[in-house]
């Protein structure tokens, strides 16, 4: 890994989703962004829902995404770490991304330090939620026995069902998402709970599809990374400041 350079954060590419930007155009845009930051990147963090649906069988992976996966592989081959956080749309990974593409896989939140500042990183699904139905749904998605049963389906059936499920979501239907305020936003509630246990300078989340910063208190800031369905948004740590940017 380089001793100097910038840290980049992005999430919610939803590669393969046929809503908003055309899927192939979105993938090409993501690849252009990766190539544009690779030269001065110390590390790149992809915070979940990179794919709109990803179910990895032991010997079979979903069709497509060759431009993206090839670019990531070139970046990791060059010595730049690329971190992949699973999201609620692509939590069903095995070892393909790590063994073939060189990515570092994270399945839970990570707290780390860059240049003396403490960062808490996560996709964000289920964190701080009070909705019992959503907690049950996530428990089903993560259940090893049920995952093994689903993997017994032929890939054409299993992946086909997954894409239909994704299109039935609010995101798949193209519905707008809104900010609900500090008391009702799950991830802000979660962040405040974390702050009772440790000091965090920056929380960075995906999942909400909101491109925004929120000052939780004088010394703690929350960043929602937005998405690449409409925004093309990302965050950049330059060693002293966290900058929020858009990629055209």
Please place each PLM-identified region on the residue numbering.
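N-terminal short leaders/motifs
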Residues: 52-75, 170-200
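Conserved beta-sheet core of the metallophosphoesterase superfamily
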Residues: 104-107, 120, 125, 131-137, ...
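Active-site-proximal loop/helix segment associated with metal-binding centers of metalloenzymes
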Residues: 124-186
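Core catalytic region of metal-dependent phosphoesterases/phosphodiesterases
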Residues: 2-6, 10, 15-114
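Active-site metal-binding loops of divalent metal-dependent hydrolases
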Residues: 11-14, 49-50, 88-89, 124-125, ...
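Structural motif
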Residues: 114-115, 237
């Amino acid at each position: 890994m380089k001793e100097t350079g910038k840290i980049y954060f992005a999430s919610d590419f939803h590669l393969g989703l046929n809503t908003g930007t055309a899927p192939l155009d979105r993938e090409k845009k993501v690849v252009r962004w990766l190539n544009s930051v690779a030269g001065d990147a110390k590390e790149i963090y992809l915070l979940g829902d990179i794919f709109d649906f990803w179910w990895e069988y032991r010997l079979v992976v979903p069709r497509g995404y060759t431009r993206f996966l090839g670019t990531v592989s070139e970046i990791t081959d060059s010595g730049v770490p690329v971190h992949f956080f699973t999201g609620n749309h692509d939590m069903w990974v095995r070892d393909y991304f790590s063994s073939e593409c060189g990515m570092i896989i994270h399945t839970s939140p990570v707290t780390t330090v860059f240049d003396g500042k403490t960062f808490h990183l996560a996709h964000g699904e289920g964190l701080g939620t009070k909705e019992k139905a959503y907690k049950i749904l996530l428990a089903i998605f993560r259940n090893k026995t049920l995952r093994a049963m689903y993997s017994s389906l032929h890939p054409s059936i299993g992946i086909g069902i997954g894409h239909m499920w994704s299109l039935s979501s609010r995101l798949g239907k193209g519905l707008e998402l809104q900010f609900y305020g500090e008391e009702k936003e799950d991830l802000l509630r979660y962040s405040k709970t974390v702050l009772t246990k440790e000091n965090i300078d920056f929380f960075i989340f995906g999942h909400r599809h909101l491109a925004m910063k929120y000052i939780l208190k004088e010394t703690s800031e929350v960043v929602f990374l937005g998405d690449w369905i409409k925004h093309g948004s990302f965050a950049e740590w330059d060693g002293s400041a966290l900058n929020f940017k858009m990629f055209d």
